[in-house]
């Protein structure tokens, strides 16, 4: 039985690509046609690639591996966090810190500090400190939790990383590839498919569609750990269909927000 239906993909709007003038020629095999200056992604290809990604991720998790879910766009942060937690995997839903994978020993030290701060607070040690110092400690803890909370239980590098928009998360993708970590990614028509090992051609601005794919990858992880994957009805209940305005200016259909520039020159030293 297919893990996703064409109807689900149609309803979620994953088939609308970018403007034809912005396309990456390497995405040609995944494009069906163009309409009103917008590329239309081939849903048959999307379905096939989702199946491949699902099975490979399932195999990795079944073999005892772990996955890291990465998506920092504001509209999908909650989905990344909730689905990673549901499937008992790691996640990063805020800015990626340079060196998270390639300089993991340093990241582990920050994680140890985060655990220490939590322990100190739980044991009541902060009650003995001046109020000003407690405020500073809480601020430090909250900042560490924001950027490292999703990987605070990660003792070793993951075997797979699932990325929403590999172009935006280029530093994370480069780190994973350097270390031989399998990269799964939602790739739009303006992206380079060579960045990832398992491509899922889809509109990365279609919020419901992106959530659908995140949900599917989480299901693969749930199955891989011996659990029961959620049914489509559960996803639909959590993400009801909304009417779309196909005539909205300066937007692709199903695009929930305009694109924002990506700032990737940030590093772990800022926390």
Curated annotation (Swiss-Prot):
Give the matching SUPFAM superfamilies: Ribosomal protein S2 (SSF52313)
Q: Which GO terms describe its cellular component?
A: cytosolic small ribosomal subunit
Q: Where is the composition biased (Polar residues)?
A: 262-271
Q: Which BP terms in the Gene Ontology apply to this protein?
A: translation
Q: Which UniProt keywords apply?
A: Ribonucleoprotein, Ribosomal protein
Cite the Pfam families for this sequence. Ribosomal_S2
Family matches, as InterPro entries: Ribosomal_uS2 (IPR001865), Ribosomal_uS2_bac/mit/plastid (IPR005706), Ribosomal_uS2_flav_dom_sf (IPR023591)
Q: Where is this region: Disordered?
A: 235-271
Q: Name one GO molecular function term.
A: structural constituent of ribosome
Gene3D superfamilies this protein is in? Glucose-6-phosphate isomerase like protein, domain 1, Helix hairpin bin
UniProt family annotation: Belongs to the universal ribosomal protein uS2 family.
Tell me the protein's name.
Small ribosomal subunit protein uS2
Q: Which organism is it from?
A: Onion yellows phytoplasma (strain OY-M)
The top of its lineage is: Bacteria, Bacillati, Mycoplasmatota, Mollicutes, Acholeplasmatales
